[in-house]
């Protein structure tokens, strides 16, 4: 194979190198049992990688505790860009009478990911294999009750408010009539605004940029009009009868069995799933990541380094207090250490000068004493005692001293 510059340009090499790197993207999906979380995950990933918890339940669901289930799926778009999609599922969410423990587990997990990044940033020598586990999007599934948010919905969303990009969706939207769905969306939006819940609003982040694309603005206005997204998941996949392996054809054949009648869930007229998937994995993926790092994490980091006591969450969700000094920037610590060492060296150097000066003064004093003793016919013996000397010895010593 010829690898000359005529066949392989530097731009092509850079593109190949870029395509080899996967984009790390993390989504947490929250919903009560039976809300269709597993179905949504399987539809999002294009396969049955998740077994619904309801199908494996053998005990009273109210005795089960919340667990965080992690799934990783490698996806690739038409241009060859790879996405390492990390999905955190939440089986048994809100199964207990008191849901505070469930809220705490999820909030602790989200905060822990921030703490891990904060600790990594504070290290002088960073880990090149460090994996960023921050949650970029939290999809909250709302049951299709025909009403607004439930008390559990409100309390949980208030717990995670300002900690993550929240996207509310109505699950199993096909159980509502178009009129009921429209009313349900209006009531949910009203509750979100009344309770001060900051759900994700499309394009607010982009408006801060110098360049504004009118087409993008219109598209984002359209997306905002769909919130909360109405989703219908798929529990069965059928191959294309024409034998085509084209992904677009396969997508159109995803169906949901409802009263034994198949529903094409990729039809945007009755289902927002295709739009939601495109938002998550194509059009707004980088925006979710940027907001998570530049806005949400920076606010958390500022609070953590502001001098206030806060809670560091370890992997076991046990908490321990950490003060500001534990998060001092390493550069500041190094400067303080260098200053301390410099002062210590100066003190040692000055002590040596003083000792040398004292020794010289003592030596001169001894010489003067010795001269006076010799003049009087005396001297120091080996024990340091003063004794008389013979006259000739005294003369010789006087000559030596002179």
UniProtKB/Swiss-Prot annotation:
One Gene Ontology molecular-function label: GTP binding
Description of post-translational modifications: Hyphal induction causes immediate phosphorylation at Ser-395 by GIN4 and at Ser-394 by CDC28-CCN1. GIN4 phosphorylation at Ser-395 primes CDC11 for further phosphorylation by CDC28-CCN1. CDC28-HGC1 then maintains CDC11 phosphorylation throughout hyphal growth. Ser-4 is also phosphorylated in yeast cells but not hyphal cells.
Knocked-out gene: effects: Causes greater curvature of cells growing in a filamentous manner and morphological defects in suspensor cells and chlamydospores. Leads to reduced tissue penetration and non-invasive fungal masses in mice infected kidneys. Also leads to hypersusceptibility to caspofungin.
Effect of residue 394 to A: Blocks phosphorylation of Ser-394 and impairs hyphal morphogenesis
InterPro entries: G_SEPTIN_dom, P-loop_NTPase, Septin
Entry keywords, A to Z: Acetylation, Cell cycle, Cell division, Coiled coil, GTP-binding, Nucleotide-binding, Phosphoprotein, Virulence
Record PTM Phosphoserine, positions in chain: 4, 394-395
One Pfam family it belongs to: Septin
Region annotation G3 motif: where it falls in the sequence: 89-92
Domain (Septin-type G): residue spans on this chain: 21-307
Coiled-coil blocks: 318-376
Function summary: Septins are GTPases involved in cytokinesis that assemble early in the cell cycle as a patch at the incipient bud site and form a ring before bud emergence, which transforms into an hour-glass shaped collar of cortical filaments that spans both sides of the mother-bud neck. This collar persists until just before cytokinesis, when it splits into two rings that occupy opposite sides of the neck. The septins at the bud neck serve as a structural scaffold that recruits different components involved in diverse processes at specific stages during the cell cycle.
Homology family: Belongs to the TRAFAC class TrmE-Era-EngA-EngB-Septin-like GTPase superfamily. Septin GTPase family.
Name the UniProt record assigns to this protein: Septin CDC11
Gene (UniProt): CDC11
